[in-house]
Regions:
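A conserved beta-strand-loop-helix scaffold within acyl/acetyltransferase catalytic domains
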Residues: 36-46, 50
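Active-site rim helix/loop that mediates acceptor-substrate recognition in acyltransferases
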Residues: 1-25
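Conserved acetyl-CoA pyrophosphate-binding loop and the N-cap/start of the following alpha-helix
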Residues: 66, 70-78
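Conserved beta-strand in the GNAT
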Residues: 22, 30-40, 56, 61
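Conserved beta-strand-loop-alpha-helix junction that forms the acyl-donor binding cleft
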Residues: 91-102, 117-118
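Conserved acetyl-CoA binding element of GNAT-fold acetyltransferases
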Residues: 48-64, 115-116
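Conserved GNAT acetyl-CoA-binding A-motif
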Residues: 76, 83-95
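Conserved acetyl-CoA-binding loop of GNAT-fold acetyltransferases
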Residues: 88, 104-114
Length: 118
């Protein structure tokens, strides 16, 4: 983890605004082989959606030796279930091209988001 990220992450975990999900191997000496996070974002309500929290899924990663086993999907499903349990109706993420199919199978669709780096 990047050192300057630690204080940011610790604050959000303590506030309950960041949830982490990990998958470990079985056995006496388990290893974390996959994980991801859910950032709960304060969001302005609109006439289309009065909900004031959105979920942003980030840092989904699977160790190379454990890929192609559905672990990224399981991590993402855990994030989505956490959203549902909190009544959150919108979840977003940014996907690597290689992972796009995983998210599309879960119902994610491309949007019209644009970005400008300042």
């Amino acid at each position: 983890m990047v050192d300057n990220c630690r204080p940011w992450l610790h604050k959000r975990v303590a506030d309950g605004n960041y949830l982490g999900f990990l998958i470990e191997t079985a056995g006496d000496d388990p290893l974390v082989v996959a994980g991801g996070g859910l950032l709960l974002l304060d969001w302005p309500p609109t006439h289309l959606d009065p909900q004031t929290t959105r979920g942003y899924i980030l840092n989904v990663y699977v160790e190379p030796a454990h890929r192609q086993r559905g672990l990224a999907r399981r991590v993402t499903e855990a994030c989505l279930e956490a959203c549902r349990a909190r009544g959150i109706r919108v979840a977003t993420l940014h996907s690597a091209d290689a992972a796009r199919g995983i998210y599309e199978k879960l119902g994610f669709a491309a949007t019209n988001e644009m970005r400008l780096n300042l």
